């Protein structure tokens, strides 16, 4: 039972910038497209780094006039060189993912590295999309009826010895309640774990009984 993939939730096509893109142009792009980060790519579209709002804000905070939200153009300089560019701002060698990775794998990757977004690469290593924490969380917006159907058909309907007709499945805002009878006690944790793995499930309440067990009174 596969999870949703990165491809199903990522933003694509994606805004990309070159290493020489200037500070102000980066700010304009983030504002225009209402995004919080942008990948820096080489001429072939392969990732060199990422520039985020946090990177831009750190630059503003370092200016001589920290009270100015719009520093004068001449203040956005690095040493004796020209305007600050993406190459100066970016986090190099970004952690990336692929379109066919599951949303769970992408979430673990973000959590492990403390990241808010990941570039998505095609088979040639070129940036074709971006996926953010918010994108991954969209799987929890699946309709209850869709979640229930997947549990009945893809979970209960595929476990040997389990009859979907003997198990009640209620879903409310992603919260699942299972009731009814399974033939053997060892099948209960299997059913519960598989239901928890369904995209969009927030919690699973167990009211299952092994075959032959007496229902609790009260």
Task: Kindly give the residue locations of the regions a language model identified.
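Tandem CBS (Cystathionine beta-synthase) repeat/Bateman regulatory domains
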Residues: 1-218
């Amino acid at each position: 039972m596969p999870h949703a993939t990165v491809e199903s939730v990522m933003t694509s096509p994606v805004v990309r910038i070159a290493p020489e893109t200037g500070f102000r142009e980066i700010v304009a792009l983030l504002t225009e497209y209402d995004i919080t980060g942008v990948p820096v790519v080489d001429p072939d579209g392969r990732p060199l780094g990422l520039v985020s709002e946090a990177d831009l804000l750190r630059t503003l905070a370092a200016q001589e006039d920290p009270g100015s939200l719009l520093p004068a153009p001449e203040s956005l300089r690095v040493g004796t060189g020209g305007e600050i560019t993406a190459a100066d701002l970016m986090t190099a060698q970004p952690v990336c993912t692929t379109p066919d990775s599951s949303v769970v794998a992408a979430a673990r990757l973000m959590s492990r590295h403390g990241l808010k977004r990941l570039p998505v690469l095609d088979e040639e290593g070129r940036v074709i999309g971006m996926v953010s924490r918010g994108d991954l969380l969209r799987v929890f917006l699946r309709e209850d009826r869709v979640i229930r159907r997947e549990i009945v058909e893809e979970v209960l309907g595929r476990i040997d010895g389990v009859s979907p007709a003997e198990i009640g499945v209620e879903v409310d805002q992603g919260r699942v309640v299972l009731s009814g009878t399974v033939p053997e006690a060892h099948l209960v944790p299997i059913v519960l774990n598989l239901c928890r793995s369904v995209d969009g499930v927030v919690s699973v309440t167990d009211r299952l009984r092994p075959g032959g067990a007496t229902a609790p009174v009260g």
